[in-house]
Structures are given as structure tokens and as C-alpha cells.
């Protein structure tokens, strides 16, 4: 229906999820490994449902002949798979899906590693037209170093909490996890403000353009700003305005 109402503009993104907190509430006993297996069964089934008159008899789902209606305008509807490990890259490419990757807070070295994994998957499936590859990164554009340091500090806070949620060890009350302590900050120098400034896409418009050009040269053909962070509304607004006004024209 969304594809019809948007006149064929829908892209469908599928991922296995990340947090044990979510797995435990979705299905007790579910872990990342099984979530990945379920995703691998789900994706081909969704592709066939969009074609229509599809019967499924899998390990996790079984249903009689079924069709998704109304029929989508796009044939096929573009599907994106979030991937980090080589097996997921290979699965996505083998099934004709586009791929989205993120280096998280690991920097440009990891950006290249992820591209290498994608290229390996494409080389293993020469019969499949090369899918698109999207890079997702936390991005903050500002004019002064003072603003950039403040933005980097907000990203540090985000990743500290991201890791705490991921470990699923801290108590959660009223939907919020316990606050980060100074000891936890000190124990993770890899998430220092300086490293956030270097590893995330943080910089002046010219600096951000230069790094985006380097990703384009690697072979990435789409970019997505990871906006979720510990920044204020005003920081996010000003960041987006600068990106739109001064970064995007370089790629028009």
C-alpha cells in the first residue's frame, strides 16, 4: 500500500536487531544467532509474497498460498539488509538485496573493511547485478571547533549508553537504563571525545565533504546520517541545516 500511495518510492529495510533487551521481550530465549536465522528465512519469503501466490514451509514460519495486496508498483520493491559480518553481506548480495553498513564508532578504517566485505560478497556472486551500498554514520557539521567538541561529547554519551544497552547487564526502570558513571567513562578511552571527533563524521562543511568524497571513491553510492544521539534539538537542527545547505550541493 505504501508503495502504491507513494507512486513507487518505498524502500524496505530489514535487520535482525541488536539489543538482548528487545529479544527477551519479543520472544523469551531468542538470541542474536537465532534472530539472524529468522531474518534469513524472512527475506526470501517477503520477496515472494510481494510477487504473489506464495506458500511457505520453513523452520520458523508456515503459511498457505498468500499474496501481499495491493500489489506494489515497483517490481521488485528494493530491500535493504543491515550487515556487518561477511555472512550477512553474502546473504544479502545472493538474494539481490541492497546493503546498509555502519562502522559505529570505529572510524574510516572500519569503513574500508566493510567495503571490502561487500566487494568479496559481490565477487562471490557474479550472476547478481551489483547491489547498492549505503553507509550509515553519526554526522555532525559545525563551523567552530568549540561546537564540534560539544557535538563529539554528545556522541560519546550516545555510544556509552549504546554499549550499556547492548550488554544488557544494567537495571532498567520506567524504560530508562541507569546513568553512566564516571568510572564507566574512564574505562572506555576508545570512546573519548577526541576519538568521537576523529572516528565519527564530525567536522566543518569542507572536512565533511572531503571525507564523504573519500567514501564515494571507495565505492559507496548512498549515505545516511545517523541522527539519533545525545545532542539537543538545536544541535541536530543546526547540524542538518549546515549539511543540507553546505555539504549536499557538493554532490548535486
Can you annotate each of these PLM segments?
Residues 19-30, 94-96:
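Acidic/polar active-site rim loop that often engages polyanionic ligands
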Residues 32-68, 109-220:
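An alpha-helical appendage that flanks or caps ligand/catalytic pockets
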Residues 22, 103-108, 226-239:
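Glycine-rich, proline-tolerant flexible connector loops at the mouths of alpha/beta enzymes
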Residues 2, 46, 79, 92, ...:
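Conserved, mostly hydrophobic/aromatic
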Residues 10-14, 79-82, 97-102, 131-138, ...:
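Hydrophobic faces of well-ordered beta-strands that scaffold small-molecule active sites
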Residues 1-7:
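Active-site-proximal alpha-helical scaffold in enzymes
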Residues 38, 42, 240-252:
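Alpha-helix-loop-beta-strand connector modules within alpha/beta enzyme cores
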Residues 5, 95, 218-220:
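Structural motif
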Amino acid at each position: 500500500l505504501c508503495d502504491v500511495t507513494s507512486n513507487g518510492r518505498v524502500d524496505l529495510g530489514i535487520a535482525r536487531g541488536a539489543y538482548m533487551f528487545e529479544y527477551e521481550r519479543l520472544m523469551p530465549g531468542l538470541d542474536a544467532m537465532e534472530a539472524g536465522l529468522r531474518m534469513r528465512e524472512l527475506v526470501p519469503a517477503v520477496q515472494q509474497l510481494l510477487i504473489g501466490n506464495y506458500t511457505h514451509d520453513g523452520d520458523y514460519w508456515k503459511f498457505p498460498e498468500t499474496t501481499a495486496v495491493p500489489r506494489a508498483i515497483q517490481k521488485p520493491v528494493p530491500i535493504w539488509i543491515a550487515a556487518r559480518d561477511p555472512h550477512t553481506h553474502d546473504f544479502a548480495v545472493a538474494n539481490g538485496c541492497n546493503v546498509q553498513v555502519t562502522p559505529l564508532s570505529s572510524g574510516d578504517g572500519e569503513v574500508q573493511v566493510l567495503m571490502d566485505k561487500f566487494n568479496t560478497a559481490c565477487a562471490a556472486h557474479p550472476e547478481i547485478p551489483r547491489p547498492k551500498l549505503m553507509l550509515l554514520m553519526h554526522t555532525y557539521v559545525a563551523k567552530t571547533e568549540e561546537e564540534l567538541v560539544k557535538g563529539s561529547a554528545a556522541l560519546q554519551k550516545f555510544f556509552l549508553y549504546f554499549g550499556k544497552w547492548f550488554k544488557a547487564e544494567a537495571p532498567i526502570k520506567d524504560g530508562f537504563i541507569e546513568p553512566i558513571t564516571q568510572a564507566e567513562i574512564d574505562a572506555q578511552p576508545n570512546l573519548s571525545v577526541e576519538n568521537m571527533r576523529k572516528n565519527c563524521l564530525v567536522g566543518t562543511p569542507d572536512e565533511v565533504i572531503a571525507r564523504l568524497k573519500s567514501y564515494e571513491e571507495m565505492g559507496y553510492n548512498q549515505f545516511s546520517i545517523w541522527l539519533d544521539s545525545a545532542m539537543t534539538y538545536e544541535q541536530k537542527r543546526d547540524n542538518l541545516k549546515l549539511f543540507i545547505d553546505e555539504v549536499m550541493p557538493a554532490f548535486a
